[in-house]
Every structure is written in C-alpha cells, then in structure tokens.
Amino acid sequence: PYRRQRQMCIRDSNLPGLVIDIYAKTAVMQAHSAGMHVDRMVIAEALSEVMGDKIENIYYKSETTLPFKADLFPENGFLKGGSSDNIAQEYGLKFHVDWLKGQKTGFFVDQRENRSLLERYAKDRSVLNMFCYTGGFSFYAMRGGAKLVHSVDSSSKAIDLTNKNVELNFPGDPRHEAYAEDAFKYLDRMGDQYDLIVLDPPAFAKHKDALRNALQGYRKLNAKAFEKIKPGGILFTFSCSQVVTKDNFRTAVFTAAAMSGRSVRILHQLTQPADHPVNIYHPEGEYLKGLVLYVE
C-alpha cells in the first residue's frame, strides 16, 4: 500500500527489501535485497503506472544498501526523468532533500508524526535538537513557538543543509543557531539552558554483536540529557536500531534516569507511522522506538 502525501513513503512487508520514498514529484527507490535490485526496472514501470503524473522522476539509490556478498555493484542514478528540484513539503514546512548524497533516501520520513507532536510542546521553550541532520525537529519547534532552537550535528554537511532549510521556512529568524559538533562533547559543555531536548541518533547497532555497546551508548547519551535538562523539561528520545528491542531501549533510558537522580514520567511512547507497517511475524520491523518524557 502507499500513502498519498506530498512527501510519502512506500514500504510493504510483501515486498521485502524495497523502500520507496516520494518527495514532491520524485520517487527515491532503494533495494536492500538482490531480488529487488534485479527487478528494479519492472518496479519502476509499475510505480509509474500506479502514480501516473504524480511522479516525474525515479531515482535509484542502492550503492550502499545491497548485501556485499551478492557482488552486484549497483550504480545510483535516475531510472526516469532527471530533475534536480529537491524541495519537498511536510505538513506545510519545506525541506531540501539530498537524495543524491544524503542518508537513506535523503530524509527521515518515518519521524514526521513525531515531529508534528513535538510542535505541540515547543511554545516558549528553549529547544536542543541533537543529531539534527536536515533540521526537521527544529523547524516544527520554531513553528510551535519555541524561544530558541539550537541544532547540533557532527556533520558540517548536515549543518549546511539545516541552515538552507531554515532559510526556506524562517528566513533571518534569530531564534535558530546550528553547530557542527560531536553530540557528547556538546552535552558535556552545555549548561542547563534547555527545557526541551531531542535525541535522535543514528543507529548505534546494526547487528547483534554490537548490542551491548549500543545500550551503553544510549545510557550515556540519555544520562547526559537528564543531567542537563531544566526541571519541568521534556525529553524526546529515540532509537532506530533494529536489533535494539523496545524493552532494551526502555531499560537503557530508565537506567539513565536513575543514574541522574531525576524523577521522570512517560508522556508518550512513539514508533514509526502506518506507512512503515510491521509484519507480526517479523517484529524486528518495528525498528523505531521513542519516548517523550517529563523530567521533574
């Protein structure tokens, strides 16, 4: 199934290993299995038939996602069209989507409902968006009435993209500042000026052998946030690691809260949206876990 939006995502458990995200009139297709790669042109033709004139371009991006043992050596490139127009909309906000060189298909569509939720909590708050990438959470916070928003990412390219997106949505707005800096170093040096913090790191573990270190990383990261956030603050914290279960993540976060000595209450338990369906026989498909926490 697919969901019609200006920015949308097609992920069907009956087509394992296939991801299609649609940004305005461009579909970005990604194969994670050899079978999907082999049938990429058939899939592109079927997508064109179903979507009609709603899409004009299909970009194939699988150089880094196919199994190495398959020895397929795919090349990224357009299967249809070739437009360089990369601006998409999400709930009224505009974003430059870097599907050529960006992470995944260029944007994290799986967080859109969680970004929208954050907007409701942002009014008059000082917001820190860690691992900001394109700045998605930051702009929802700004639209929600945040007093100030700081976006942090270790990648200078991500910060450049965030700043471009600021100019698309809030040109010249003095409330926003962006920093290219390691997350842990930033948390170490920052004061207690924030009362809403977003922790949305990249996957800390992509295989089970890395699980133990990943959980240590989540504990350390969240403990820093609990230590620094203002009393009465709101923490949005996430894990997108498939091998980290919901219980694993909750235990890591709750342990971090205990380590910090802060009293914490759960406001929301978050996951991916309906167009990222989870097959009940493949629970690992529920890769996105999130908590919204009130920190006393």
Model-predicted segments: where are they?
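Single conserved hydrophobic/aromatic residue that forms the stacking wall/gate
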Residues: 1-10
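Conserved SAM-binding motif I beta-strand of class I
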Residues: 148-153
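S-adenosyl-L-methionine
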Residues: 157-198
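Mobile active-site "lid"/loop adjacent to the S-adenosyl-L-methionine
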Residues: 194-224
